[in-house]
Amino acid sequence: MKFTIMDTRIFRRGVRSGTVVRLLMLGAVIYFAGNVRAQETANAPTDAETVKALLQRVQDLESEVKTLKSQVQALNPTPANDISSTPVAASSGTVPVSTAMAEHEVMAVRADADPNMPRLQLRGFGDVNWKASDLHGQTNSFALGQLNLFLTSRINDKLSFLAETVIEADQGSNEFGIEPERLLMLYSVSDRLNLQIGRYHTGIGFYNTAYHHSAVMQTAMGRPFLFQFEDNGGILPIHNVGVSATGLISNRLGLHYIAEIGNGRSARTSISNPVQNVTDENNGKAFNLGFYVRPEAISGLRFGFSGYHDHVSPLGGANISENIFAGHVVYQTSRFEFLNEAVVLQHTPDNSNVTVNIPGFYSQISKRFGNYRPYFRYEYVNVPGRDPLYSDVALVHGPRAGLRYELDESAAFKIEFGRDMRRNQGAVNLIGTQFSFAF
């Protein structure tokens, strides 16, 4: 369309200038409206074709999902000794890996679509060590530590699952063993009541519930001797199978409680596993009740105490009443820690009025300077010779001093020196290094 602007003198003689302006604007509107209408007409078939193609793609995907699910349901599980990526006939009784992967992807899509569907999370922890001492007859050795597979699953807002499975080699036989150190259903009613049902770490003191089976989380190379695991010579019931309840009593005071009941542990002199996972050796149950305070006024401070009671049945001997009283005062921040714990075990045979007291304590201090954290710990345990359960431990005490270097947030290198002094034995000097990591 072409517009010709006439000489302005003509407008002055016959046509008003306002009329011409209005004509020009009307022509422009007609021109652009025609172009827009043409574009809409051209795009309409394209949009319709796009929508149709998308709908067809959705139908195809739904059909594929239904086909894959029907195939998986129709086939048997894959035998453990026949893992192949090549699809085989259904009559062979194996599921092709490609089909299993497709089913896994379908489940993943469902999990993404449904936020309430349980989700399994896996973390791993491990450590490698080198240790040496001047004890006669002992060799220096590199040693694999614990491989810790830590599983959690949130089922809903209140219910979750936790499993901590450790793969570890025996020091004597060098053979690997697998043990679920913690296996728990967790039910959170509120801040005032949280339940753990299954195999848990007993709430005796601070260290046992603050540090579990991960070396990278601990400042030093190992746990204090007082809190060593049962199968490593420890004298405390570190694990228990039963029910544990924890919760907040007073938010203003920062007061919390711990209440536990379980099978307890068997006598260490028994040939059975110290942790009574399936069968209790007697009808009595172990009880533990504790309280601790975390005052808001002093961030990082915690102090508390607990009392534990059980009956232990050693082979060929009378039942033994066991009481354990523990107290702790801890100050811990990201850069500084000062851990102090004391425990007294009391053993009283049922056929005697004599009570044997076993005192023990440790104190650990460390401070972080950049990526470096030097630390020092002194520990002490004294088991009298007349104790019916742990007389072989006797008196052991001594210092540990070391340096931890943070490679990053998930890995650390440690070097440590120690000196163990035992009753009726000479002192033993120790040196060790450790590389610990999380993945």
What spans do the regions from the language model cover?
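Hydrophobic alpha-helical segments of integral membrane proteins
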Residues: Y31-F32, M185
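N-terminal periplasmic/intermembrane-space "pro-region" immediately following the signal or transit peptide
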Residues: V36-W130, F439
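Outer-membrane beta-barrel pore domains
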Residues: L135-H136, L184-S188, Q196-R199, S214-M217, ...
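Interfacial loop-to-helix transition and helix-capping segments at the boundaries
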Residues: Q276-G284, I320-E322
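N-terminal secretory signal peptides that target proteins for export/translocation
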Residues: M1-T19
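Active-site-proximal beta-alpha loop/turn segments in soluble metabolic enzymes
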Residues: E260-V278, D310-P314
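Outer membrane beta-barrel
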Residues: M107-A267, N283-N288, Y292-S299, Q364-Y375, ...
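Bacterial N-terminal signal peptides
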Residues: V21-Y31
